[in-house]
Structures are given as structure tokens and as C-alpha cells.
Regions:
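Intrinsically disordered, low-complexity, mixed-charge
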Residues: 14-134
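Extreme N-terminal basic, low-complexity initiation segments
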Residues: 1-13
């Protein structure tokens, strides 16, 4: 009766785990950021949403943006849009934003014709810079 033996072992392990980890503690509670005190952002941190038009898709724009943002210690993300534009959200020292765009445009292929922007509240939980929409 192997099944009875395994069932007994499983029940025993389940009881042991329940005694160690109370049921009210969820496995991913550490991800509930709203329940934790947010990290303190450096003074002057800004988050900005950019909608960028021009020759910005199929030319390495997103990867150049990621490289530049990481080099400048900025966080955020970049994503291609269906209308041919690119959306870029960047957070950090706003004095570095012009250099970010200068680094992105150091390409024979990227041509920015229009940039629309709006300020957003900073996200204290954000870490790193990602390329969305592979």
C-alpha cells in the first residue's frame, strides 16, 4: 500500500509546513508594496512620460534608450506603439534627460521629429530600465 504511505507523508509534511508558516502569511506578501514604507527617492527625482514620433521604430531606438538610461542611472521603460511612435517613461535627475536623448540620437537611423511630454508622479518602487513589447 504505497499510496497510503505517500498520503501519510504528504499529510505529515503539510502539517509541519502549516506549523512553521501560519496560514495568514501569504507566500508573496513581500510584494505588497502598498503595505510597506516606500523607499526615499533622491531629492529632485522626476518622472516624465514622452511620446516620440519620427523614424523611431525598426532603428534600434528602444535598445539605445535602454543603454543610455542605464549609463545615466535613470529608470523607466520604453515601448513601440501601433501608430509608429515610441513611448518612453523615464525617472531620475531631470538634468540627465537631455543627455539621454542626445545618446539615443547618436545614430544614423534614429530621426526624432516630435516629442510630447508630461510629468508624472515618481515611482519609488521602480528599479532599472526595461524594453517592453518584444
Amino acid at each position: 500500500r504505497i499510496d497510503d504511505g505517500l498520503s501519510g507523508i504528504v499529510r505529515m509534511m503539510h502539517r509541519a509546513v502549516r506549523s512553521i508558516i501560519p496560514q495568514e502569511v501569504a507566500m508573496f506578501d513581500f510584494l505588497k508594496q502598498k503595505d510597506r514604507t516606500p523607499p526615499v527617492l533622491p531629492e529632485g527625482t522626476v518622472r516624465r512620460h514622452f511620446s516620440i514620433s519620427g523614424q523611431v521604430q525598426g532603428v534600434g531606438f528602444r535598445y539605445r534608450a535602454r543603454y543610455a538610461a542605464q549609463a545615466l542611472e535613470l529608470t523607466g521603460w520604453v515601448e513601440n506603439e501601433d501608430d509608429g511612435s515610441v513611448t518612453l517613461e523615464v525617472q531620475g535627475d531631470p538634468d540627465k534627460f537631455p543627455e539621454l536623448f542626445a545618446m539615443i540620437q547618436r545614430s544614423d537611423y534614429v530621426r526624432i521629429t516630435d516629442i510630447r511630454q508630461k510629468d508624472l508622479p515618481p515611482d519609488p518602487w521602480e528599479r532599472g530600465f526595461s524594453v517592453r513589447g518584444y
